[in-house]
């Protein structure tokens, strides 16, 4: 990739984050996951916990600081995280509306960058004209 293009991409990413677009998208994705995807995830998590409670009846009598790591281990051994991430990737992150929001944000930043560069060129040319 050309060095100038790489610098422009890096600048674009930096501006995207600095202007709050990344945080806004992250919140939007989290809201979508909470609204649409959390039900099946919580049901599956509850099933894993119930199965672990059946396997080890002493979990109910243990304090939460001892029981929580055991249950977390059961969740880790399941494919809950991987399946959830794959589901989110294929159903939430690939959503066309989300892609349009990202594209429009990047496009706006790019337009602002071009306008800024044009202003700098104009100022530089005026400065150079004044020196001649």
From Swiss-Prot:
- Alphabetically list the UniProt keywords: Cytoplasm, Nucleus
Q: Which InterPro entries match?
A: BOD1/SHG1_dom
* Superkingdom of the source species: Eukaryota
Q: Provide a GO biological process annotation.
A: transcription initiation-coupled chromatin remodeling
What GO cellular-component annotations does this UniProt entry give? Answer: chromatin; cytosol; nucleus; Set1C/COMPASS complex
Q: Where in the cell is it found?
A: Nucleus; Cytoplasm
Q: What does this protein do?
A: The Set1 complex specifically methylates 'Lys-4' of histone H3.
Assembly and binders: Component of the Set1 complex composed of ash2, sdc1, set1, shg1, spp1, swd1, swd2 and swd3.
Q: What is stated as this protein's family in its record?
A: Belongs to the SHG1 family.
Q: Which named protein is this?
A: Set1 complex component shg1
Per the UniProt entry, what species is this protein from, by scientific name?
A: Schizosaccharomyces pombe (strain 972 / ATCC 24843) (Fission yeast)
